[in-house]
UniProtKB/Swiss-Prot annotation:
Family per record: Belongs to the glycosyl hydrolase 2 family.
Pfam families: Bgal_small_N, Glyco_hydro_2, Glyco_hydro_2_C, Glyco_hydro_2_N, LacZ_4
Gene source species: Klebsiella pneumoniae subsp. pneumoniae (strain ATCC 700721 / MGH 78578)
Domain of life per record: Bacteria
Protein name: Beta-galactosidase 2
Organism lineage: Bacteria, Pseudomonadati, Pseudomonadota, Gammaproteobacteria, Enterobacterales
GO molecular function, one term: carbohydrate binding
UniProt KW Magnesium keyword: yes
Length: 1024
C-alpha cells in the first residue's frame, strides 16, 4: 500500500521539476562505472559481473498529456490500457507524442523555471524478481544511464527519488524498498522540466528512458569511488600511476586496498595500503580515503595513434587477503598540458582532426547501441579523424571505453546549453542556477575522468559567459589539473577557457559582431597578450552539399603551429525514418512530424547520412586530414609523416604514371618513416608519351594488413600531380562530305550522313538532333546560369523570414531564375568544310539584361559540333551560380564514362580529394541523394564525357541525372523526386564554389565566385 508521503499527489504538489535548486532527491554520488566484481581475475579480464543485472527489455508504458492526468492507482498496478515498449527508447519513436526539431528557439514558452501545464508524461513500470542473496546483505542499486528530461521513481509503491540531467546517470539505493518475490518499479518521466532550459541543444527534442537501466549489488562495505592519474618524468621513461580510492561502510582497521596494474597477463606493478594516512590540513586527513602510487618503468604511452592500454584492478579486502569487492578500469599512460601556446600530448603538439558528434540513429532516435558506436569510430578512423567532441552532452558511457580502445581524443562536454535565452547568459550568470549547472559539470568529471581518451573538459555550449562558468572552471582546475578546460561562450577567449575555441571563425575574414567579435583565426593568434592555442570547436558546417573551402583551413593549420585544428560540424545527418501510406520508409526532418517550432532541414549537417553512408564531402575531409604529406621535385617524392608517435610499419606507397587514365608505369615502395620524419623516394625514369593527353603521377598509401579499425588494403593517403599536357597536332584529313544546310521559315537544319541538327530560328536554340530516325533531345540546348539552391545558398532564408543577403534571395531578386532569352541574332553560314550557326541571346528579367550569350556552332564533315560560348555578365547583377549549358537528352544509358576529376562529386572549392582519371560509374551513382534536394553530382576538370551515343570534349564541369534543376529546386524531400523522362545534362564552363565556412551567411570565398564580367568556353560534341 502506498504511504501518504509516497503518494503521487504529494510529488505533484511539490513540483520538483520547476525548481532549479532541486536537481535530485536521494540520488547517489557520481562515480566511474562500477561492476562490483567478487573475483579479481574477472575484474582484470573485464568479464560480465555476476553482481550486475540489466533491466533493458519490455516495460509497460502509458502516456498522459500531463503529470496531473496520471491516476494514483498506477503506483500499485499497471493500467488496463498500458502498452509495451522497449527500454531503452524514446517514446516519440513509438508513436507517442511527436519529436520536435529546433536549433535555437526553445520548444516551450520561455519562463524559467516553469514549464507548460501540458507536459507529456510517460509512465513506465516493470516487475522483476530479485536474487534472495542480494536481500540478505549489501546494497542493491538501480542505475538509469539516461532519462529525458526528469523522473520520479517508486518501488513497490514507495517513492524512492527524483533525478534530472538527461545525459548522466541517476543512481538510487533500492535496498530498503525490495522484498522477496516479485518487485515492481514505477517511473514517471516528464518531457519538460526546469532542466530543459539548460538543454537547448541543436537536436531533436525527445523523451523517455533512452539509455540502459540496470541493477547493481554491492557489499555493505564497498568501494564508493576511485580515480586514476598518470605522472611522468621529463622524458616519459618513468611514470607513476596514482590511484585515489574511497570507501563507504563500516571503517575497520583490517581493511586494505590493493591496486594492481596489468598489461595483458603480466602484472606490471602493485601496491597495498590501509585507509587514511594522508594529511590534508591541520585537522588531519580523510579516514575513508587512500592514495596509492605505483612506479612504472618505460610505460607504453597511450595516444590516438597507438592506444596502448593497461588494466588497473582496485581490490578492497581484509588484512588476511579476503576479497570484499573489486572494481577496475583501463588505464592509458598519457600527459596532456599546454605549454608555450601549444596543446601537447606526451610532449608533442597535437593537430586536432576533429568532428562533432550527436548521438543519433534514424530508427531509434537518441538510443545508441554498441554496433552504431563502433561503426562511427571505425568510419572516423578510416577517414583520418583523431578527435571527437561530444556535442553537446556527456555520451553513453560505453562510448568512452570504445574511444580508449580504438584511439580517439575526446572533448567531454557538459549538458548545458541556453542558446535560446536573451541574453544567452541569463541563466548562466544567475546564482540560482549554479547548483544545476554544477551538478552537470561535476558529475561528468566524476564519471569520466579515468578515461585516457578524454583530453579536454568542456563547460557546455552556446550559453553566453556567466559567473557560473568561471566558478565551474575553477572547480575543474582544482579537482583535475591534468586536463585543459575549454568553453566557447562569450567570445571563445574568456577567463573560463584554456583554449581559444571559436565556432565558424574564418581563416582570413573578421566578423566583428557587437560584444563578441569573431576574428579570423590568423588574427586571433596575434591579439595583444594572447598566448593560448586555438582549436575551432566547430567549423566547416557540412550541411547538405557543403565543405567548400575546407582546404584553406588545413593550409592555415599546417602553417601556424598554434592553430591546432578543429571539429567539423558535424558527423551525422539527424534525419528520422517515417513511413508513407504504403509502408515505404523516408527520411524526415524538422516540421515533418507537425512539430512547432521547427528549423526544417537544419538538423542535417552530417559528413555521413543518418544510416552512416558517407557524403562526398567526407572524402575531402579525409584527404585534407591525411597523416602523410607529399611533395614532388623532379623524380623525387618527399613523404612527410604527421604522426607524432607512430612509425610507419604497415604502409606501402603505390605510384602510377598514366596518360589520360591509361597506365604507363607503376611501382610500389615500403614506407619507413619515423614519427614526424621524412622519406625520399626516387622514381625510375618516367615515360615520355608521344600521343596527346594529360600525364599524371598518382601516389596512394595503402595498408597491406588489417588493423583494429581498417581492413587490409585500406588507402589512408593519396596525392596527384599533373606532369605534362601534350597537345595534338591535327593533320589534314581525307576530305569529308560537307554538311548540308537547309533553311526554312522556322528552322536551320543541317544534315550529314544519318545525323541531323535542327536550330529554331525563333528561339535561336539547338532544338533537336537525330541519329537515324531517333530523336536525341527532349528539350533544347539552352544557357544555364542558376542551380537548385544549396543549403549554403539558402542560409537562414525561409518563406516567413527572408534574408536578402542569401545567395538564393539575391538571385531571385535579380531575376536569375525567371530570366528569359531574347534572341538578338541567329544566322547560318556554309563554309568550305562546315556549317556555322551564330546566335546571340540577351537573358532578361523585367526589361533588364542580366547576361549576353554569344554562341557559334560549327558542324564539320566529321559530324563534330564545336560550340564556342562567350558570356557577358551585367555589372549590376549578382555573381551567377554557373555559366553553362543544359538540355534533356532522350536516352537513358546505364553508365557514365568520363575523363576528369572523380570518382566522387566535386566542386571548384571542394576538389582536392578528387583524382584525374578515366572513370566509369552507373548513372544512379552520379546523383547524390541529399535528403533536402539541391544541386549535386558535379564533376570538375573534365576533358571528355561519354554517355550513350554521345561524346563531349573540352575543359568543363558536368552533372547528369534523371532530375532537372527545376525539380530539385521545387521538391522538399528526396523521396518525393521522380525520375524524369530521359536524362538531364548540365555542362558548365564555370561553376561557383559551394562554400561551407557556415551555412547561414554567404561563405563562398571570392576566388571561387564568378565575379568576372566576361567568360569564354568551348565544347566539342560528337557521336561515337
Amino acid at each position: 500500500m502506498t504511504m501518504i508521503t509516497d503518494s503521487l499527489a504529494v510529488v505533484l504538489q511539490r513540483r520538483d521539476w520547476e525548481n532549479p535548486g532541486v536537481t535530485q532527491l536521494n540520488r547517489l554520488a557520481a562515480h566511474p562505472p562500477f561492476a562490483s566484481w567478487r573475483n579479481s581475475e574477472e575484474a582484470r579480464t573485464d568479464r560480465p559481473s555476476q553482481e550486475s543485472r540489466s533491466l533493458n527489455g519490455e516495460w509497460r508504458f502509458a502516456w498522459f498529456p500531463a503529470p496531473e492526468a496520471v491516476p494514483e492507482s498506477w503506483l500499485e498496478r499497471d493500467l488496463p490500457d498500458a502498452d509495451t515498449v522497449i527500454v531503452p527508447s524514446n517514446w516519440q519513436m513509438h508513436g507517442y507524442d511527436a519529436p520536435i526539431y529546433t536549433n535555437v528557439t526553445y520548444p516551450i514558452a520561455v519562463n524559467p523555471p516553469y514549464v507548460p501545464t501540458e507536459n507529456p508524461t510517460g509512465c513506465y513500470s516493470l516487475t522483476f524478481n530479485i536474487d534472495e542473496s542480494w536481500l540478505q546483505e549489501g546494497q542493491t542499486r538501480i542505475i538509469f544511464d539516461g532519462v529525458n528530461s526528469a523522473f520520479h521513481l517508486w518501488c513497490n509503491g514507495r517513492w524512492v527519488g527524483y533525478g534530472q540531467d538527461s545525459r548522466l546517470p541517476s543512481e538510487f539505493d533500492l535496498s530498503a524498498f525490495l522484498h522477496a518475490g516479485e518487485n515492481r518499479l514505477a517511473v514517471m518521466v516528464l518531457r519538460w522540466s526546469d532542466g530543459s532550459y539548460l538543454e537547448d541543444q541543436d537536436m531533436w527534442r525527445m523523451s523517455g528512458i533512452f539509455r540502459d537501466v540496470s541493477l547493481l549489488h554491492k557489499p555493505s562495505t564497498q568501494i564508493s569511488d576511485f580515480h586514476v592519474a598518470t605522472h611522468f618524468n621529463d622524458d616519459f621513461s618513468r611514470a607513476v600511476l596514482e590511484a585515489d580510492v574511497q570507501m563507504y561502510g563500516e571503517l575497520r582497521d583490517e581493511l586494505r586496498v590493493t591496486v594492481s596494474l596489468w598489461q595483458g597477463e603480466t602484472q606490471v606493478a602493485s601496491g597495498t595500503a590501509p585507509f587514511g594516512g594522508e594529511i590534508i590540513d591541520e585537522r588531519g586527513g580523510y579516514a575513508d580515503h587512500v592514495t596509492l602510487r605505483l612506479n612504472v618503468e618505460n610505460p607504453k604511452l597511450w595516444s590516438a595513434e597507438i592506444p596502448n592500454l593497461y588494466r588497473a584492478v582496485v581490490e578492497l579486502h581484509t588484512a588476511d587477503g579476503t576479497l570484499i569487492e573489486a572494481e577496475a578500469c583501463d588505464v592509458g599512460f598519457r600527459e596532456v598540458r599546454i605549454e608555450n601556446g601549444l596543446l601537447l600530448l606526451n610532449g608533442k603538439p597535437l593537430l586536432i582532426r576533429g568532428v562533432n558528434r550527436h548521438e543519433h540513429h534514424p530508427l531509434h532516435g537518441q538510443v545508441m547501441d554498441e554496433q552504431t558506436m563502433v561503426q562511427d569510430i571505425l568510419l572516423m578512423k578510416q577517414n583520418n579523424f583523431n578527435a571527437v567532441r561530444c556535442s553537446h552532452y556527456p555520451n553513453h558511457p560505453l562510448w568512452y571505453t570504445l574511444c580508449d580502445h580504438y584511439g580517439l581524443y575526446v572533448v567531454d562536454e557538459a549538458n548545458i546549453e541556453t542558446h535560446g535565452m536573451v541574453p544567452m547568459n541569463r541563466l548562466t550568470d544567475d546564482p540560482r542556477w549554479l547548483p544545476a549547472m554544477s551538478e552537470r559539470v561535476t558529475r561528468m568529471v566524476q564519471r569520466d575522468r579515468n578515461h585516457p581518451s578524454v583530453i579536454i573538459w568542456s563547460l557546455g555550449n552556446e550559453s553566453g559567459h556567466g559567473a557560473n562558468h568561471d566558478a565551474l572552471y575553477r572547480w575543474i582546475k582544482s579537482v583535475d589539473p591534468s586536463r585543459p578546460v575549454q568553453y566557447e561562450g562569450g567570445g571563445a577567449d574568456t577567463f573560463a577557457t584554456d583554449i581559444i575555441c571559436p565556432m565558424y571563425a574564418r581563416v582570413d575574414e573578421d566578423q566583428p559582431f557587437p560584444a563578441v567579435p569573431k576574428w579570423s583565426i590568423k588574427k586571433w593568434l596575434s591579439l595583444p597578450g594572447e598566448t593560448r592555442p586555438l582549436i575551432l570547436c566547430e567549423y566547416a558546417h557540412a550541411m547538405g552539399n557543403s565543405l567548400g573551402g575546407f582546404a584553406k583551413y588545413w593550409q592555415a593549420f599546417r602553417q601556424y603551429p598554434r592553430l591546432q585544428g578543429g571539429f567539423v560540424w558535424d558527423w551525422v545527418d539527424q534525419s528520422l525514418i517515417k513511413y508513407d501510406e504504403n509502408g515505404n520508409p523516408w527520411s524526415a526532418y524538422g516540421g515533418d512530424f507537425g512539430d512547432t517550432p521547427n528549423d526544417r532541414q537544419f538538423c542535417m549537417n552530417g559528413l555521413v547520412f543518418a544510416d552512416r553512408t558517407p557524403h562526398p564531402a567526407l572524402t575531402e575531409a579525409k584527404h585534407q586530414q591525411q597523416f602523410f604529406q607529399f611533395s614532388l621535385s623532379g623524380r623525387t617524392i618527399e613523404v612527410t609523416s604527421e604522426y607524432l608517435f607512430r612509425h610507419s610499419d604497415n604502409e606501402l606507397l603505390h605510384w602510377m604514371v598514366a596518360l589520360d587514365g591509361k597506365p604507363l608505369a607503376s611501382g610500389e615502395v615500403p614506407l619507413d618513416v619515423a614519427p614526424q620524419g621524412k622519406q625520399l623516394i626516387e622514381l625510375p625514369g618516367l615515360p615520355q608519351p608521344k600521343s596527346a593527353g594529360q600525364l599524371w603521377l598518382t601516389v596512394h598509401v595503402v595498408q597491406p594488413n588489417a588493423t583494429t579499425w581498417s581492413a587490409a588494403g585500406h588507402i589512408s593517403a593519396w596525392q596527384q600531380w599533373r606532369l605534362a599536357e601534350n597537345l595534338s597536332v591535327t593533320l589534314p584529313s581525307a576530305p569529308h562530305a560537307i554538311p548540308q544546310l537547309t533553311t526554312s521559315e522556322t528552322d536551320f537544319c543541317i544534315e550529314l550522313d544519318n545525323k541531323r541538327w535542327q536550330f529554331n530560328r525563333q528561339s535561336g536554340f539547338l532544338s533537336q538532333m537525330w541519329i537515324g530516325d531517333k530523336k536525341q533531345l527532349l528539350t533544347p540546348l539552352r544557357d544555364q546560369f542558376t542551380r537548385a539552391p544549396l543549403d549554403n545558398d539558402i542560409g537562414v532564408s525561409e518563406a516567413t523570414r527572408i534574408d536578402p543577403n542569401a545567395w538564393v534571395e539575391r538571385w531571385k531578386a535579380a531575376g536569375h531564375y525567371q530570366a528569359e532569352a531574347a534572341l538578338l541574332q541567329c544566322t547560318a553560314d556554309t563554309l568550305a568544310d562546315a556549317v556555322l550557326i551564330t546566335t546571340v541571346h540577351a537573358w532578361q528579367h523585367q526589361g533588364k539584361t542580366l547576361f549576353i550569350s554569344r554562341k557559334t556552332y560549327r558542324i564539320d564533315g566529321s559530324g563534330q559540333m564545336a560550340i564556342t560560348v562567350d558570356v557577358e555578365v551585367a555589372s549590376n547583377t549578382p555573381h551567377p551560380a554557373r555559366i553553362g549549358l543544359t538540355c534533356q537528352l532522350a536516352q537513358v544509358a546505364e553508365r557514365v564514362n568520363w575523363l576528369g576529376l572523380g570518382p566522387q562529386e566535386n566542386y571548384p572549392d571542394r576538389l582536392t580529394a578528387a583524382c584525374f582519371d578515366r572513370w566509369d560509374l552507373p548513372l544512379s551513382d552520379m546523383y547524390t541523394p541529399y535528403v533536402f534536394p539541391s544541386e549535386n553530382g558535379l564533376r570538375c576538370g573534365t576533358r571528355e564525357l561519354n554517355y550513350g551515343p554521345h561524346q563531349w570534349r573540352g575543359d568543363f564541369q558536368f552533372n547528369i541525372s534523371r532530375y532537372s534543376q527545376q525539380q530539385l529546386m521545387e521538391t522538399s524531400h528526396r523521396h518525393l523526386l521522380h525520375a524524369e523522362e530521359g536524362t538531364w545534362l548540365n555542362i558548365d564552363g564555370f561553376h561557383m564554389g559551394i562554400g561551407g565556412d557556415d551555412s547561414w551567411s554567404p561563405s563562398v570565398s571570392a576566388e571561387f565566385q564568378l565575379s568576372a564580367g566576361s567568360y569564354h568556353y568551348q565544347l566539342l560534341w560528337c557521336q561515337k
